[in-house]
A protein has these predicted regions:
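Sec-dependent bacterial lipoprotein signal peptides
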Residues: 1-28
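Membrane-proximal, proline-rich intrinsically disordered regions
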Residues: 30-80, 319, 388, 428-466
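Conserved, well-structured interaction surfaces
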Residues: 56, 93-162, 197-207, 343-352, ...
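Inward-facing hydrophobic residues that define packing positions of alpha-helical scaffold repeats
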Residues: 59, 120-123, 188, 195, ...
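Hydrophobic-face positions in mid-chain alpha helices that act as interaction patches
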Residues: 237-356, 385-386, 401, 409, ...
Length: 466
């Protein structure tokens, strides 16, 4: 018993000594051990971003943000079309494959949305900062401002091409209302303004001649002008019979761009391990196996269905002239959807062949079949494919040819779903009741934005397009 009492006393003394030691040390360490107001010496405070010396770094960060946003949202758009299909176990990929793109709770749409919103905000912020530097005469390299405008144009037109509605005026913790689906054309107007500023800087604004920036700006401006006209057709209450795009500005820009581009030119954003979205199209396709290139394009591996069969045997879609597996599709699949590609899928933003297809469509809209064939055949020549000759026998076959060539030449570039809507095409995987069919819907403002932004659509789980 005495031993037990002694041990208790010793324990009590030890605890008292420990408490005294902690009390003695606290003033030397901090007044409150739970105080979180400790400065991180590695943090960049916003005031530092007011230094013109950081302009290049700021623009590089914007480029990384835009690229990350694309990796996070491209799969949602592609699986909702016939470009990709669900092959895994996650139900929300299946609902997209079924044509239900309008669900704001979909985990993949909701997971990608914040990256797109971040890139939109950062583009506005970066362009404004560098414009201030340029006005003050302190911007060291005007190409940085041109690049910022190009990245901004990419994210703005991506929003216009992929989303039903969006919040454009929010500023960090300051909420704002969405602009409304009927007003989404302003995203393309913003992209046109940004690419125009980039062109002005490159051509007359004191930037040393930069042919690559000029190509990018011209090609992206053509895409933006074309995209605005396409959205107006695809999202009309009733898709008009005259469902071809003929925009004078897009045609002029495409023509000018082709004078600067080689026939094989493509401007790509290629992600790295440091700028991938948490759930990204590369990982879901080439690692996890949740999604795969669509069944109209490819044949699956006979033993592993979430992989494309090896080589040309993996290509299901035939070329209408050669009658054999499309080498255009084969090249596209090799660039995006093979295990060897991994997570870092290059994403084409503009290309010479897209410029040719814009010009081809404008000629077809004008009833100029010969001019249409000239441009389409030029785009096919990029892959050394033979020209169309006697295959075009009517306006209907010409239009079907246009849809086919856009389908294979612009694969996985965020163009397909609106083409499907305007041409009346449907994915075999779409359910008859799916809102992708019924409402020609695009990606909605998703759950997280609705939950955190009181001005966003409510209730936060309600479909606004059906």
């Amino acid at each position: 018993m005495r031993q037990m009492i002694s041990m208790r006393r010793l324990g009590s003394k030890s605890r008292l000594l420990g408490a005294a030691l902690v009390a003695a040390l606290l003033p030397a360490a901090c007044a409150n051990p739970f105080d979180t107001s400790v400065e991180n010496p590695n943090a960049v405070v916003e005031e530092a971003l007011g230094d013109p010396a950081g302009a290049t770094t700021l623009v590089n960060g914007l480029g990384a943000s835009v690229t990350r946003a694309l990796t996070g949202i491209a799969g949602v758009y592609a699986v909702s079309s016939d470009e990709m299909t669900w092959t895994g176990s996650r139900e929300y990929w299946k609902t997209l494959d079924d044509g239900d793109i309008a669900d704001p709770v979909n985990e993949y749409a909701d997971g990608g949305f914040p990256y797109v919103a971040e890139a939109r905000w950062l583009s506005d912020y970066t362009i404004a900062r560098l414009t201030e530097f340029n006005t003050a005469g302190t911007l060291r390299n005007k190409k940085d401002l041109a690049r910022a405008n190009i990245y901004g144009a990419i994210i703005y037109m991506t929003i216009g091409e992929m989303f039903d509605d969006f919040v454009l005026a929010s500023d960090r913790t300051v909420a704002a209302a969405p602009i409304g689906g009927a007003n989404m054309g302003v995203t393309f107007d913003s992209a046109v303004a940004m690419t125009t500023r980039a062109l002005t800087l490159v051509q007359t604004g004191g930037v040393a001649a930069d042919a690559e920036l000029e190509r990018q700006a011209l090609g992206l401006r053509a895409r933006a002008r074309y995209g605005k006209a396409l959205r107006a057709i695809a999202k009309a209450a009733t898709v008009p019979a005259a469902n071809l795009v003929s925009d004078a500005g897009a045609t002029a820009d495409a023509t000018a761009a082709l004078t600067k581009m080689t026939s094989t030119y493509a401007f790509k954003l290629t992600p790295t391990a440091n700028n991938l979205a948490g759930i990204n199209i590369g990982y879901e396709t080439n690692n996890r196996g949740e999604i795969r290139a669509g069944s109209t394009f490819v044949n699956p591996n006979p033993t592993v269905i979430y992989l494309v069969a090896d080589g040309i045997a993996g290509i299901k879609m035939n070329d209408p002239v050669t009658g054999v597996a499309s080498t255009t599709v084969s090249k596209a699949i090799d660039a995006c959807c093979r295990r060897t590609v991994g997570n870092n899928i290059p994403m084409i933003q503009t290309s010479a062949r897209e410029m040719m297809l814009i010009l081809a469509e404008a000629r077809l809209a004008a009833g100029d079949t010969a001019g249409f064939l000239t441009q389409v055949n030029a785009s096919r020549a990029v892959d050394a494919l033979p020209a169309y000759t006697t295959q075009i026998t009517s306006a209907a076959t010409a239009k079907a040819t246009l849809e086919y060539e856009r389908k294979v030449q612009l694969y996985l570039q965020g163009r397909r779903l609106m083409d499907m809507y305007r041409f009346g095409s449907a994915d075999a995987r779409w359910l008859a009741s799916g809102v992708g069919v019924r409402g020609r819907c695009l990606i909605p403002i998703t759950y997280t934005e609705r939950l955190t932004n009181p001005d966003a659509p409510q209730p936060n789980n309600e479909r606004k397009c059906s």
